[in-house]
Amino acid sequence: MTKGTQSFGMRHNKSHTICRRCGKRSFHIQKSTCACCGYPAAKTRSYNWGAKAKRRRTTGTGRMSYLKKVHRSFKNGFRSGKPAAAVAASA
């Protein structure tokens, strides 16, 4: 058997399986690390040379149920639901 193209047909074992954090088939079984998100590291793996990859999974690509509310309340100056206090007229 040669060490080139013919040998690649002999490969059967999977080196990567599904990652529990990102859901991609990038979790290396022997290394126990994900090639996509870096799991089990606390911080998500991201590099500037992967600008497209960053764009796919950055803030704003999901539901953003809380951040949408924050933007709305920021526009209104973070007012609570109470009516504004009456200001004494100086005459």
UniProtKB/Swiss-Prot annotation:
Cite the binding residues for Zn(2+). Answer: C19, C22, C34, C37
| One Pfam family, short name | Ribosomal_L37e
Q: Does the keyword Cytoplasm apply?
A: yes
Q: Where are the zinc fingers (C4-type)?
A: 19-37
- Single Gene Ontology BP term? cytoplasmic translation
Q: Where in the cell is it found?
A: Cytoplasm
Share what the entry says about its subunit structure, partners included: Component of the large ribosomal subunit (LSU). Mature yeast ribosomes consist of a small (40S) and a large (60S) subunit. The 40S small subunit contains 1 molecule of ribosomal RNA (18S rRNA) and at least 33 different proteins. The large 60S subunit contains 3 rRNA molecules (25S, 5.8S and 5S rRNA) and at least 46 different proteins.
UniProt cross-references to InterPro entries, sorted A to Z: Ribosomal_eL37, Ribosomal_eL37/eL43, Ribosomal_eL37_CS, Ribosomal_zn-bd
Q: What GO CC terms are in its UniProt record? A: cytosol; cytosolic large ribosomal subunit; preribosome
What does the record give as the function of this protein? Component of the ribosome, a large ribonucleoprotein complex responsible for the synthesis of proteins in the cell. The small ribosomal subunit (SSU) binds messenger RNAs (mRNAs) and translates the encoded message by selecting cognate aminoacyl-transfer RNA (tRNA) molecules. The large subunit (LSU) contains the ribosomal catalytic site termed the peptidyl transferase center (PTC), which catalyzes the formation of peptide bonds, thereby polymerizing the amino acids delivered by tRNAs into a polypeptide chain.
Cofactor(s) this protein cannot do without = Zn(2+)
Keyword annotations:
Cytoplasm, Metal-binding, Ribonucleoprotein, Ribosomal protein, RNA-binding, rRNA-binding, Zinc, Zinc-finger
Instruction: Give the Gene Ontology MF terms in alphabetical order.
Output: RNA binding; rRNA binding; structural constituent of ribosome; zinc ion binding
What the record notes about the co-factor is:
Binds 1 zinc ion per subunit.
Miscellaneous field: There are 2 genes for eL37 in S.pombe.
Name of the protein this chain belongs to? Large ribosomal subunit protein eL37B
| Predominant location | cytoplasm
The similarity annotation says:
Belongs to the eukaryotic ribosomal protein eL37 family.
PROSITE patterns (UniProt xref): RIBOSOMAL_L37E
